[in-house]
Each structure stands twice: as C-alpha cells, then as structure tokens.
Amino acid sequence: METSLETLWSQVLERLQLQLSRPTFETWIKTANAEQLDENRLVIRTPNPFARNWLQKYYVKTIRDVVHEILGHPVEIQIEIAQGDSNATISAPEVASPPPTASPVENTNTSQRQQASLNPKYVFSRYVVGPNNRMAHAACLAVAESPGREFNPLFLCGGVGLGKTHLMQAIGHYRLEISPNSRIFYISTEQFTNDLIAAIRKDGMQKFREHYRAVDVMLVDDIQFIEGKEYTQEEFFHTFNTLHEAGKQVVLASDRPPSQIPRLQERLCSRFSMGLIADIQPPDLETRMAILQKKAEYENIRLPREVIEYIASSYTSNIRELEGALIRAVAYISISGLPMNVENIAPVLNPPTAKISASPESIINAVADTYGISIDDLKGNSRRREISMARQIGMYLMRQHTDLSLPKIGEEFGGKDHTTVMYSCDKVSDLQKKNPELAQSLRQLGDRIKLANQP
C-alpha cells in the first residue's frame, strides 16, 4: 500500500516526538515540512538556513531511520530552505568548537571589555555544551559571527543559573576579538530602569538616548523585570526599534519566554518574539560532570572521578549551585588537609533533597481523590467533560513527576494510545498558562504527590 506524503510526515512527526526532547522537537522538527516524496527521496523544507544546517548536522540520520522504518525501504533525505529564503546566507556554526581567537583574558583590549561590563571568564571556550543548551549556544555563536542578520533579536530563556549570562557576555567578547572597536553594551534591566529614572530627574533624556542607542550589540539581562514598568517599557520599545532598524544586534535574556512575562506590552512581546527564542534547560548528568571537569581544569584542581560523579549527582537544578558545591568541597579539603574523596566532602556539601520520582499509583490516587472521580472512571473511556479533564491532568502530572515514556503512561490509564497522552500533556500545559486556578491546582497536586512519595 502506497503511503501518501501527508500520512508519512504525520507518522514521522509522531515517532520523532517520542524520541526527541520537547524543546528539540518544537524548535527543529515541528517547524519543518515534507514537500516531496519520490520512490527513493524525501524532500524536507525548513524555514531558514540555520534550521536546515542544524537538521542536516544533527538529525538527518534519525529522520532517515524513521522514514526507512515506516516505508520499509531506505530513502535519501534532502533538506532544503523554504521558498523565499533561498538567498539567505547565514549557516550554522560548528557547535562544539570554540571561536578561533585568543582568550579574552590574555587579550590587551581590556578597557573596551570593562566599558562593556564583561566578565573575563564568560567566553565561549569556557562554556560546556550539552543537549540542554546546544541550540542556544549555536545561536549565540551565529549572532557573534554575524550580528544583526539571522536572529535579531535573540531571546534566551531558562531558569536561574543555567548559563544565559555566560552566553550573552561570550557574544560580547567574541565581537571585541574580531572587531576591537565594536560598541558592545551589556546591561541588566534594572540598570536600564535606574539610568532612565536618573535621566528624567536630571533632564538628561537626550543624553540617555544617545548613550543607549549608539551601540552595535546590546545585551540585556533579566528582561522579565521590565514587567509592569510602563515608562521603562515605553522607552525600551523605542530604543529597541532604533537599534533593530539600524541593523544592530539585540540579545535578551529572561527566566521565561516573552509570552509568559506578565504585564508586558503586547508590542514588546511581539518584538521580543520575532527573532529566535532559544530555551536552556537544566544540564543532564553527563553535562554536569563535564562542567565540573572543565571548572577543575581551569582552576588547576585534580578531582577523583567519584567526587565529580557525587557532586554532579547531588546538584541537578542549576550550574551556580553545582560550581558552588565544588568550591566548598575544594576549600574544605584545602583547609582540613584531608584527602579529596566522597567520604570527606559529603558532610560539608549538604546537597539539596533529590527530586522524588513518584509512583504512578500515587498520582492516580491523588487526582481521583481531588476531583471526586473513581479510579475506574479515570482509567476508563468516559468522555464526560469532568472525567476527561481529570484524566488529562493525571497524564500531565505523570509526565512531570515520573520518568515513564508516553506509551507507559498510556498503559497506566487503561491502555490509552501515546498520541492521546501527548495531546493531553500539551493541552494541560497550554491551559495552565491561561488559567491561574488550574495552575494553582496543579501545584497543589504536585505538592501532594511529592509528600506521598517521600521515603
């Protein structure tokens, strides 16, 4: 039986969504389209050259294997740029390669770096790349090489201590290596607001505007703190427009995407979203170990592997805590004179409580009890609105609080298909962003589930 292009691509998307992380799927796969299917060739089109190069470099083999599995015979995967973008010239950088320039610490143009408020340690060569940050790292390299062209603005979002500031400042260092006379400006949103207030008090708005709009690359940290500040938003809107229209690069960092920043003017939200939004997730175990190893190398510290594994396994939420634990361990060993091993450092580290992996039964019981629904109904096929919604919430919570795959979650709910689980998780995730009551209910259920699963 011949498979149509639409059917094939739908099946490919379903399988890739199971294999890849959600940020990867949403950013690189979901934005692509299958355009043509011949006997031995599938043509896939991407929205821009960066996406094309990224798919070609990292995911073409995965796509080829999935298509082969569906069709029953091998096909060539050809990735092209969608019509209208064929003249674009930016290509993806080598992600794992540091910039081919001298270390900023050893460079002589110190005054420019000080004026730009750049930390000498925040360079690309000291940034550890893993699955959690590969897209953001590659996008920052692309911006550093060709500012104001492909991703403008570039919006980095991720939790506290995940490396957003490091990447932003690495862009500044890179530009100053290539072009020492570049005007690089790294600021926090708080600094922008304080400077604006001072300018208003001193009748210095003209000087303020000249200062902030005469830059080549503007790097703005913690942009989420602009929320609710109407006059700051007004001034930043015009500053952003002036820079963007002049082809100057703007890079923004936040702990959440633009659409989730409360009391943000719609026009600013639109502008923040019109470039690339690159998400940074907490690092996995291997990346955390690599971060510790690199930190130890730069500080000329010898660490046994078991110590690296212990610290990396104990601190999972962010890089600042991870590096802070390493510093405490090294300081204690240095002062005490004891050998560096897990037994000696464990008492002084006091790692945070490990994330509790919940049992599926505890989640089902909590949801059934909260919504007054029997477990049989929750696992059944009833389409009654209140039962269906509770079932979707249960699937979402099981996705959040267990390591079960989508098919396994489906089995826990009476043998539901993995696509049903996928739809349910996406629906609840979207609804909670618009419904504060649902978000609060999910938090309370999450706390209840954690309490029920404590040892």
Curated annotation (Swiss-Prot):
- Quick one: where's region Domain I, interacts with DnaA modulators? 1-73
Instruction: From the UniProt entry, list the residue stretches annotated as the region Domain IV, binds dsDNA.
Output: 334-455
- One GO BP annotation of this record: DNA replication initiation
Chief subcellular location equals cytoplasm
Question: Where is region (Disordered) located?
Answer: 92-116
Its annotated function is as follows: Plays an essential role in the initiation and regulation of chromosomal replication. ATP-DnaA binds to the origin of replication (oriC) to initiate formation of the DNA replication initiation complex once per cell cycle. Binds the DnaA box (a 9 base pair repeat at the origin) and separates the double-stranded (ds)DNA. Forms a right-handed helical filament on oriC DNA; dsDNA binds to the exterior of the filament while single-stranded (ss)DNA is stabiized in the filament's interior.
| Protein's recorded name | Chromosomal replication initiator protein DnaA
Tell me the organism.
Acaryochloris marina (strain MBIC 11017)
Q: Which gene encodes it?
A: dnaA
